[in-house]
Amino acid sequence: MKKYNNIIRSFIIVLITLFCAQSPAFAIQTISINQGHADPIPIAINKFAAESNVSRLSNNILDVITNDLKNSGLFRPISPAAFIENKTGVEHRPLFAAWRQINATVLVNGKVRRLESGNIEISFVLWDIIAERDIAGEILEMPEKLWRRAAHKIADTVYERVTGDKGYFDTRVAYISETGG
């Protein structure tokens, strides 16, 4: 009987040793994050005030700004057909309640004019509809041929002031080719 007790005792010791030596089993859980989701910021980009000699140019500038911000994925331009207030330009304070009714968070107002020098002047104001205050504004003067670059700069300013990140629309790509030995 003593022999069986020793065998049982040895067997129990082996079982306890094996049991203690094993690492605990944990369920392996894999979480895969492959994309984030943020709702685009609703932005109203109002028609820029312009005299007839620059109205087409004004529309082109507006299109570039709108496309830059929309294509960033962070902004959702509101259709101008939804606008309640129809004042254009930079000289007036917007009717914030009218812009809130169409769920705009920010508003861009602007003006384009041709100067006596032949250059164009583009001015704009960025309004925070919720806080009811302007958060950026600028007057740009340049030769007319640089209108597209000015539009990208305006989009950069809007992007930077609203998101806090540096804008990237006014960038240039350099290509360098090396030939010879």
What residues fall within each predicted segment?
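Structural signature of eukaryotic scaffold interfaces centered on beta-propeller domains
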Residues: H152-D170
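Bacterial N-terminal signal peptides
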Residues: S10-Q22
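Amphipathic beta-strand/beta-sheet edge segments enriched in Tyr/Trp
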Residues: Q29-T30, V90-T157
